[in-house]
């Protein structure tokens, strides 16, 4: 039902305006943004997903800035670079554009990983801070043709975050510390941006 609702909105948008459209899916850590973005793109012709997480600052830079223990907070991303890529994706429809992704094994962004060919009609981007209204993040919202906020029940969402940290090799105590100190602090920031969405969906 959630995917069907989103598909209907996207098809209405595509029928109403020509050219490439940008769909943004925001939500707290663990809400299911990546899963929904991939599912949406799979149902559409000529669609590509471009994650915000490709704009994480490199670990060496986070250490230099003293922000490594807050990785995932708004100031640990190249937000201006992300907005610039979205603008280029909107405007450069006659060439292949390469977007970065995030490698969860390396725990680092990887440049030039996602090709966006000229015939791409829909860009689906997802991440925590697409609706944040503080500079330079506010540039992102202005570039989206449809802004979606995805929420989820806290219990399953947090369980998923804990499982994610366990998969990285953290012991239970370290996983809980990271999730409740970092991920959940970021979740509160993200939840405050939900009112800036065009469409709100909930994953039960």
Q: Where are each of the predicted segments found?
A:
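ATP-dependent NMP and nucleoside kinases share a basic, alpha-helical "lid"
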Residues: 106-164
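Conserved nucleotide-sensing/catalytic segment adjacent to the nucleotide-binding pocket
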Residues: 51, 58-106
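Conserved lysine of the Walker
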Residues: 33
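Small-molecule kinase domains that catalyze NTP-dependent phosphoryl transfer to phosphate-bearing small molecules
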Residues: 111-112, 135-138, 166-204
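Hydrophobic positions on the alpha1 helix immediately C-terminal to the Walker A/P-loop
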Residues: 36
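Extreme N-terminal, non-catalytic leader segments
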Residues: 1-22, 28
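Residues at the beta-strand->loop junction immediately N-terminal to the Walker
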Residues: 26-29, 126
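Post-Walker A helix-loop "phosphate-sensing" segment adjacent to the P-loop in P-loop NTPases
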Residues: 42-50
């Amino acid at each position: 039902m959630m995917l069907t609702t989103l598909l209907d909105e996207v098809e209405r948008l595509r029928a109403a305006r020509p050219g490439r459209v940008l769909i943004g899916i925001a939500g707290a850590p663990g809400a299911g943004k990546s899963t929904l973005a991939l599912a949406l793109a799979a149902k559409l012709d000529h669609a590509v997903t471009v994650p915000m997480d490709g704009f994480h600052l490199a670990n060496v830079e986070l250490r230099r800035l003293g922000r490594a223990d807050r990785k995932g907070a708004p100031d640990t991303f190249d937000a201006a670079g992300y907005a610039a890529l979205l603008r280029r994706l909107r405007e450069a429809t006659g060439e292949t554009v390469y977007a970065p992704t995030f490698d969860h094994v390396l725990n680092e962004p990887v440049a030039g990983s996602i090709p966006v060919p000229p015939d791409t009609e829909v860009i689906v981007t997802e991440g925590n801070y697409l609706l944040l209204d503080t500079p330079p993040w506010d540039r992102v919202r202005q570039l989206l043709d449809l802004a979606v906020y995805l929420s989820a029940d806290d219990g399953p969402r947090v369980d998923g975050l804990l499982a994610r940290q366990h998969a990285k090799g953290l012991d239970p105590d370290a996983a809980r510390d990271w999730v409740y100190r970092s991920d959940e602090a970021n979740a509160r920031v993200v939840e405050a941006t939900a009112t800036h969405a065009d469409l709100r969906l909930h994953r039960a």
